[in-house]
From Swiss-Prot:
Keywords: ATP-binding, Kinase, Lipid A biosynthesis, Lipid biosynthesis, Lipid metabolism, Nucleotide-binding, Transferase. Transfers the gamma-phosphate of ATP to the 4'-position of a tetraacyldisaccharide 1-phosphate intermediate (termed DS-1-P) to form tetraacyldisaccharide 1,4'-bis-phosphate (lipid IVA). Pfam families: LpxK. GO terms for biological process: lipid A biosynthetic process; lipopolysaccharide core region biosynthetic process. It comes from Colwellia psychrerythraea (strain 34H / ATCC BAA-681) (Vibrio psychroerythus). PANTHER family: TETRAACYLDISACCHARIDE 4'-KINASE, TETRAACYLDISACCHARIDE 4'-KINASE, MITOCHONDRIAL-RELATED. SUPFAM superfamilies: P-loop containing nucleoside triphosphate hydrolases (SSF52540). This is Tetraacyldisaccharide 4'-kinase. It is an enzyme of class 2 (transferase).
Length: 343
């Protein structure tokens, strides 16, 4: 974990030096973002309302909060509702030949970024990436999509949205509660009641219940591992029975969550190593690991390692799960969003 993240989330002693130094920049960040929101509120800037409904999945802070599993969940849910979803993303970490860039079966994370490739490989859904989310969405609508799911983009106010889901890390929550760069927040806690649903990833009874806004709890369920080289799938219980120990790597926004998940499933992790989010893996990154011990990684990291993977490398797919009542609430809100555009 980087020092600044320790200051944000772990009450590191360096906070007494760094936070006062960074507070003036946070004040400037607040001023700029406030003026930007105000320009939309009073009509100086205008949001673009698309011809099809838009669902935005985002967060008010930085780092991995669990947005991608929810995007995957919404893709499957909207399909069950008879819709043809398309996903738009910034494509962070990728460099496409042009924008908006429509992914195909040959697209790589080098061009499109990590998450879009993961989503495409898992769901075979149309995906367009680019900083201009409106252009990306229009490209997908032209391809026949009748509902747009935006992976991130909560602060992209130029894109009007019909349903807004905010994801919160149920364990780390909001860190020290300060705006960037003194804290991890892009927007203050005032933003939560203005969204349609707040989803807490990982239960925190004290902080997510009895709020003055609609909120729910989700968990990330893992039942099997997938081999990077062969595609073989094996249940976690069977894998653990066959393997006493594993190594693990994670290059995501919150790598400790992945390591904790492995330990919760009773894996004995011998060596674990974290990398910065969106790290571009090369084979040399794995030199210190014993090839005789299985190496486990996230699905997001796996999309960048297929070209040089070894036979003992596995990734852990996870799925967002909700209670029946919360699932029905998501369905109801989605149907309302769709009907509001049709009318």
């Amino acid at each position: 974990m980087r020092l600044i993240e320790k200051v944000w989330f772990n009450d590191h002693p360096a906070k007494w030096l760094l936070v006062p130094m960074l507070l003036p920049l946070s004040a400037l960040f607040w001023l700029i973002s406030t003026l930007r929101r105000l320009s939309y509120k009073i009509g100086l800037s205008r949001s673009c309302q698309l011809s099809k409904p838009v669902i935005v999945v985002g967060n008010i802070g930085v780092g991995g909060n669990g947005k991608t599993p929810i995007v995957l969940y919404l893709v499957e849910l909207t399909r069950l509702l008879g819709l043809t979803p398309g996903v738009i993303s910034r494509g962070y970490g990728g460099k496409a030949p042009h924008y908006p860039y429509l992914l195909d079966e040959k697209s790589t994370s080098i061009e499109a970024g990590d998450e879009p490739i993961l989503i495409q490989q898992r769901c075979q859904v149309p995906i367009a990436v680019g900083s201009d989310r409106i252009a990306s969405a229009k490209l997908l609508i032209a391809q026949g999509c009748d509902i747009i799911i935006s992976d991130d983009g909560l602060q992209h106010y130029r894109l009007a949205r019909d349903l807004e889901l905010v994801v919160v890390d149920g364990k780390r929550l909001f860190g020290n509660g300060l705006l960037l760069p003194a804290g991890p927040l892009r927007e203050g806690l005032w933003r939560l009641p203005k969204s349609d649903l707040v989803i807490y990833n990982g239960k925190n009874d004290q902080d997510y219940q009895e709020k003055n806004y609609p909120c729910m709890h989700m968990t990330l369920a893992a039942t099997e591992l997938c081999n990077l080289l062969t595609g073989e799938r094996i249940y976690l219980t069977d894998f653990i029975r066959l393997n006493d120990s594993v190594n693990a790597i994670a290059g995501i926004g919150a790598p400790q969550r992945f390591f904790d998940t492995l330990k919760e499933h009773q894996f004995k992790v011998i060596n674990q190593q974290s990398f910065v989010d969106h790290h571009a893996f090369v084979l040399a990154d794995f030199n210190e690991f014993d090839d005789n011990i299985p190496l486990l990684m996230t699905e997001k990291d796996a999309v960048k390692c297929h070209d040089f993977c070894k036979e003992n490398w596995w990734y852990l797919p996870v799925d967002a799960t909700f209670s029946d009542a919360d699932r029905q609430l998501i369905i109801d809100r989605t149907q309302i969003a769709v009907q509001s555009v049709i009318q």
